[in-house]
Amino acid sequence: MKKNPKKLKTWSALKRERFTKNPDEAFAYLKSSLEENSDAPEIVIEAIRLVSESLGLSIEQIAKKAHKSPSTIHKALGKTGNPTLETLSAVLKTMGLKLTIAKAS
């Protein structure tokens, strides 16, 4: 009998599973991502996308809650996303989060 090889999961899939079970860890990951990668917005956007997915939020759900069009949210959270501060703030609000400012160390 042949054994079924286990499918390897991507890093993102593993994180998504873990964050689904522990939303506080997801928020800590997102905060850390922003603090450590403020000069690499694509990494921060990827983290926001990952956390929103782990919370079960679709693009359409985020758009509705953020009072934005789905295409705006899709572009904002896409691989080349560059959301406005207003859109970013609205997306974070749908996840129960807000932007804050801290003094750089």
Feature annotation, model-predicted:
Residues 7-9, 100-105:
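Short, charged recognition helix plus adjacent turn
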Residues 78-79:
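Residue-level detection of the helix-turn-helix DNA-binding "recognition helix"
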Residues 13, 82-85:
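Structural motif corresponding to alpha-helix initiation and N-cap regions
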Residues 86-102:
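DNA major-groove recognition helix of helix-turn-helix/homeodomain DNA-binding modules
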Residues 1-50, 54:
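N-terminal flexible/basic segments that precede or flank functional cores
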Residues 54-75:
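Short alpha-helical DNA-recognition segment
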Residues 58, 84-87:
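Residues that mark the N-terminal boundary/hinge immediately upstream of a DNA-recognition element
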